[in-house]
Structures are given as structure tokens and as C-alpha cells.
């Protein structure tokens, strides 16, 4: 068995794995234990009461966090004409059609989000093997295939997160940075949970949001007591 580092020993001593913490206490604990030499992200894992083997119970979507994620996001947009000008005005770093596709085929992938207008999907479709494995393929379910590319660019820049359950029915995403004010992290978490509730599949039975845990990039998960969250979540 690998020897625990001093940092991991401290984390294990501080975090009770059997306890559900009040959200304010959980955030304070994360901040106390975030001792990495960079500003760690605050990540969340939400266990959903779904059968992930059934396609009609899978949960996928996007929402804009009220306080963003703390990340600067580079956006590439496939579109043309007036939409291209609107995308540039909204802040997109890369805008084009076949020319942009050619850049990507050459391995130039200097972006975090790809957005496309419906008429551009004939071009984007050629890039499935490149964009798909990286989770960058535009999809109408998360608002990245849309006639209103300017709004999609603004959402991406404003801190939109995309979520999708894994094979175990768990959503993994980020809700900000550990140096955010505690209230902002709490409000971001609540916004995510509200979005997940709205995305609940009609076929899902029983308790839907079963467990919520937050962690930092280099830290342990801290289970959150949902009773301490706003009424809109519960």
C-alpha cells in the first residue's frame, strides 16, 4: 500500500467520510485544506437516482452559473455571414467554416468550447473523430448547436457549465475556484442542483438527488447535507 503524504494524512484526519456537512462548514473545510501551490478548482459530484443503462434516464444539459467558474474560456464558432460577425462581436476567438475545420484537422486546437449554427453542421460533422473524444462536439442538448451563436458565445464566456452523467449515474463538474467567496460557491452549487432537478427524466423513480459531494482539485470529497441548501433546491 502506498504511503500517505503528510498532506493526505491531514485531509483524512480533518474530513469525516461518514458525515454530511452543512454547506457552509463543507466550504470552510475545503478552503482550509486547499494548500496546493495553485488556485484549485472546486468540483462537485452529484449521485443521481437514475438507471444510467437506460438512454431515457440519462441526464445531459448546460447551465450558466451565477458567479461563473473562474476560468477564461476560448470559444471557436462554426458559422458564416451575419452570424460570423455577431459571434466575433460576442467575443469568440475563432470563427469560420471550412477554413476553421482545416485548422482543426492540422491539430490546431486552441479552444475550450465549440459552437455551431445548424447550417454549419455539414462542416463540423467531418470533425467527429477529432472533437468527439475530447467532448467538444457541438450538441443542441447543451446549447452548442444553435441559430443564435452570439448568445451561446456569451453564455460560454459567462461561466456556462455542461453536465452529463457517467455510467454510474454521477454528474461531475466544477462550480468555481477555491478562492471564491463562500456565498458564491454555495449559490453556484444551488444553481447547478436546480438545473439538474429541471432535467430530471420522467422515468426516474425514488430519490433523484441522492448524494452531493464537493472537493478541490487535490483534495478529498466532502459530503454536503442538502437540508442546508436553499428551498429552490429542495
Swiss-Prot record:
Keywords: Repressor, Ribonucleoprotein, Ribosomal protein, RNA-binding, rRNA-binding, Translation regulation, tRNA-binding. Signal peptide: none annotated. One of its GO terms (cellular component) is cytosolic large ribosomal subunit. It comes from the Bacteria. One of its GO terms (biological process) is translation. Disulfide bonds: none annotated. One of its GO terms (molecular function) is rRNA binding. Part of the 50S ribosomal subunit. Binds directly to 23S rRNA. The L1 stalk is quite mobile in the ribosome, and is involved in E site tRNA release. Belongs to the universal ribosomal protein uL1 family. This is Large ribosomal subunit protein uL1.
Amino acid at each position: 500500500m502506498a504511503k500517505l503524504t503528510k498532506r493526505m494524512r491531514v485531509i483524512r484526519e480533518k474530513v469525516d467520510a461518514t458525515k454530511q456537512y452543512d454547506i457552509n462548514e463543507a466550504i470552510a473545510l475545503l478552503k482550509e485544506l486547499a494548500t496546493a501551490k495553485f488556485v484549485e478548482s472546486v468540483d462537485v459530484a452529484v449521485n443521481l437516482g437514475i438507471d444510467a443503462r437506460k438512454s431515457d434516464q440519462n441526464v445531459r444539459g448546460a447551465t450558466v452559473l451565477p458567479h461563473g467558474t473562474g476560468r477564461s474560456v476560448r470559444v471557436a464558432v462554426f458559422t458564416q455571414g451575419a452570424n460570423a460577425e455577431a459571434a466575433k462581436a460576442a467575443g469568440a476567438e475563432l470563427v469560420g467554416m471550412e477554413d476553421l475545420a482545416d485548422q482543426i484537422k492540422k491539430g490546431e486546437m486552441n479552444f475550450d468550447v465549440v459552437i455551431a449554427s445548424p447550417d454549419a453542421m455539414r462542416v463540423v460533422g467531418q470533425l467527429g473523430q477529432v472533437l468527439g473524444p475530447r467532448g467538444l462536439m457541438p450538441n443542441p442538448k447543451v446549447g452548442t448547436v444553435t441559430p443564435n451563436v452570439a448568445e451561446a458565445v456569451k453564455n460560454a464566456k459567462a461561466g456556462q457549465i455542461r453536465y452529463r452523467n457517467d455510467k454510474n449515474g454521477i454528474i461531475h463538474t466544477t462550480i468555481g475556484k477555491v478562492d471564491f467567496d463562500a456565498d458564491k460557491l454555495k449559490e453556484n452549487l444551488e444553481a447547478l442542483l436546480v438545473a439538474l432537478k429541471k432535467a430530471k427524466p420522467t422515468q426516474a423513480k425514488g430519490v433523484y438527488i441522492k448524494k452531493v459531494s464537493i472537493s478541490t482539485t487535490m483534495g478529498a470529497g466532502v459530503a454536503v447535507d442538502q437540508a442546508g441548501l436553499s428551498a429552490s433546491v429542495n
